[in-house]
Amino acid sequence: MSKMLEEIRQQPVALERTFRSELKGVEKLRALFAKSRPKFIILAARGTSDNAAQFGRYLLEIATGIPVSLAAPSIFTLYGARVDYKDALVVAISQSGESTDTNMVLERARECGAFTVGITNEASSTLAKIAEHVILVRAVPVYGKRGGGGAGPELRERV
């Protein structure tokens, strides 16, 4: 069996683990935002995680009524621009938690006073250290750059 097929078959178990383990943290976030609602939500991701962000954009706008946009990380990394994310919720999605572009968006967002959330598979990753709140996907590790199966639990995390 290929690694990708193995990852795909493990998605239901990973999803169940994520929901069971992260439910209290997500409920805490919901309560926090009921008191102080962000004006907009920014999602930052690269590669297959960007697919999860695109799907999440639809779900979050429908569920919250808050405008959601995808960040363009190269605005920071290539052009050194400053973007004001004050009053925003900025969510970075990275399977490894080591995407330089995604992490830079999260760092800049924190500097602006945004509330930051990281969605990752790695509890000890750079992303997990930067984010104020972390949601662990708990999927099998993704090897190399091919991605594929690892994005499924990220997509479902949004539901």
What label would you give each PLM region?
Residues 34-159:
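Glycine-rich phosphate-binding loops that contact phosphosugars or nucleotide phosphates
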